[in-house]
Amino acid sequence: MTELKAKGXRAPHVAGSPSSPKVXSPLPCRQAAXPFPGSQTSDTLPEVSALPISLDGLLFPRICQGQDPPDEKTQDQQSLSDVEGAYSRVEATRGAGGSSSRPPEKDSGLLDSVLDTLWAPSGPGQSQPSPPACEVTSSWCLFGPELPEDPPGTSATQRVLSRLMSRSGGKAGDSSGMAAAHKVLPRGLSPSRQLLLPTTGSPHWSGAPVKPSPQSAALEVEEEDGSESEDSAGPLLKGKPRALGGAAAGGGAAAVPPGAXAGGIALVPKEDSCFSAPRVALVEQDAPMAPGRSPLATTVTDFIHVPILPLSHALLAARTRQLLEDESYDGGAGAASAFAPPRSSPSASSTPVPGGDFPDCAYAPDAEPKDDAYPVYGDFQPPALKIKEEEEGAEASARSPRSYLVAGASPAAFPDFPLGPPPPLPPRAPPSRPGEAAVTAAPASASVSSASSSGSTLECILYKAEGAPPQQGPFAPPPCKAPGAGGCLLPRDSLPSTSASAAATAAGAAPALYPALGLNGLPQLGYQAAVLKEGLPQVYPPYLNYLRPDSEASQSPQYSFESLPQKICLICGDEASGCHYGVLTCGSCKVFFKRAMEGQHNYLCAGRNDCIVDKIRRKNCPACRLRKCCQAGMVLGGRKFKKFNKVRVMRALDAVALPQPVGIPNENQALSQRFTFSPNQDIQLIPPLINLLLSIEPDVIYAGHDHTKPDTSSSLLTSLNQLGERQLLSVVKWSKSLPGFRNLHIDDQITLIQYSWMSLMVFGLGWRSYKHVSGQMLYFAPDLILNEQRMKESSFYSLCLTMWQIPQEFVKLQVSQEEFLCMKVLLLLNTIPLEGLRSQTQFEEMRSSYIRELIKAIGLRQKGVVPSSQRFYQLTKLLDNLHDLVKQLHLYCLNTFIQSRALSVEFPEMMSEVIAAQLPKILAGMVKPLLFHKK
């Protein structure tokens, strides 16, 4: 035995592993024949007896000729030294003086090369078969240290594999052991020429033992700058794995000292600390084995990945076992694709990949793959590679196949077998998580709006499925293209839902009476029944007339600001024959109104004065029909048009006011132009847009207050909240019929309603109190009227006094209905976010148009420039004062909402969403009020 000293050891030892000054290692004789020819150098090594290579009689059963067989005990120990010490790497640097010896480094190159040689088929670009072990010309030149004795009763092969299994994956003092396992393979090497070492991110074979930290040694990284041989197969890759070149890759290269052979590659890596510290070998019964598999196969498959071989026994056994043990896999599909080529193959064929570059669909990841980056079974892709997800189409599916899940399947339950061109993606099964709805397959790049999450219910009602196609525009929703999805999907930017009932609905509630509404894959939102009349609960009987079905809603005329109204009767929806008695009506409604007014009939409604008046049912209830005619503004003395003449209508509109942009109230010249009247015009024509506002005005809404019980603070507040919820639905429905409002972006529509709903409610309260009780009481609803005595008895008397100011102002100013309607629309448009709206231009045009309509409404009663300008100032000043008044209501409402449990006050769902999301924003000054006058 001869001592071999390494000069200038660079790599540090493992902590706790002592460095012996001398390590004896058996050195076999140096052979001058192939497969490692080299030039003679001055550095000669002492010749010692060659050692037999035996892997427990598995690989090479015979020993070299001319050698005496050692005794059994010596041979067993030497076999351990040979197998584990083979390919030992000695760190040597060229230095002048001083030498220190250390234990040479161990490597798993022999086992990798032997298994590669044993399993890889011969062919172009493949590894060459290893020469016979008994030939002198191609014998293995091995040297390595002596290993500590192992526990008796364990075979040499099992002890070696147990040690290889129990190694750590990193070097001493190096925290990047895991990262080393994911290094990129060098270009020019096919996957079949490399053994794929498992990492923590790689999957395990079914039935194989899973260790707590399965870290295996990765390919050694060469970090030297320029120490490479001229005849080497390839340059050293800086910071990349070193490839075995030349004959070393084919027949298993032997580690040769530096300078011994000119044609070979002297591997001078860092020290591998996986063999520096003593270890305890695993006994056979310690390692769990899969049933029907030998201990060797179980241990080897747990240690390495099987290379890409189409007919390898290990691959066939693994695939067969996988299909037998995987319960969730379908038998028919498994029989068809059980032995399909692995995913790492660039094509779906089973032809071995020749040596060369990797396909362009594979690239090196920037970071380590996640633990769930690969499926549990059937993935032979190298851990350092991942497939590009940007490829699309059938060609990309064939190159980078992915398993498509069926309904109710889990992503981890299927092996990743290659498939052909994918079929159309089926709709996803109904999920089990709350808040998630069944949707059809959509592109992953679909953007989701980041607006407030409280507008979900409003959005559901604003964009419900209608019979008529929606108005096309820059923000119009595209039509549905999912006939088999079971629901109407609107693929547009939408808001997430926060309601609890929506989660229950998505989790498996009974189907609604109309197609399920899911916006951009979001769950079905609350208050679905409020969209259609048929699904409305019984608690809303007075509101049934207003919530018409979609078939009736689609008959409503669509108006624009600069265009004339359509030929549709504003009373029954039939085709209009002209403007009769100041309103665009049909001939039937004209005759009915004339006879009813001239005959002075007292009609009584058999219902609740909320009957539906349309083309079919207009003769059912004359009382409701006459009431609707009066609400639309029909007057016996009004001007009549025998025919629907556009020219005469335009002349009548020009006589009322000129369509010029609105200006500041003190601009007398502009106001004089707008309020120019014909001297002989006795009766003014109501503008068509104001007539439309009259026709879309909501009907009476009841609070449902129980008068049989004494009034308490909680009962009154709960009744007011229920009334507010119904009025909020009424505001949404009214805004949808408002000309110009649907031209705004859906997010802007939701924002405007959320900011102005309280102003609209208190403004409507003031109008009802002014019209019905002359401002003496608060007329919340026909069944909830508070006089001054009931106000004092309530707990919100100060709040009632604040709201009472509005009807008193109406009484003082004697506001007309036309003025009220225009002011109501301006209240909807009087608060915007600080950053503005998405469709700010359309919003400003809409607001300017309704300001002009307010001026027209003022001109119907005021004659002259000065009275008209004064009237305009008074009405707009009232609108500005409403900001401060409504702010007090917001503060009280938010405090009551926070203390609702303690006060036993119930808040409905939609109102709760709006209060929780928008009131803190409004009270914090994060909105911009639009004022007519400076404070």
Swiss-Prot record:
Region spans: Mediates transcriptional transrepression: 165-305
Location of region: AF1: 456-548
SMART domains given in the database record: HOLI, ZnF_C4
Entry GO CC: cytoplasm; nucleoplasm
PROSITE patterns: NR_LBD (PS51843), NUCLEAR_REC_DBD_1 (PS00031), NUCLEAR_REC_DBD_2 (PS51030)
Residue stretches of biased makeup (Acidic residues): 220-231
Role, per record: The steroid hormones and their receptors are involved in the regulation of eukaryotic gene expression and affect cellular proliferation and differentiation in target tissues. Transcriptional activator of several progesteron-dependent promoters in a variety of cell types. Involved in activation of SRC-dependent MAPK signaling on hormone stimulation.
UniProt xrefs under PANTHER family: KNIRPS-RELATED PROTEIN-RELATED
Protein name: Progesterone receptor
Encoding gene per record: PGR
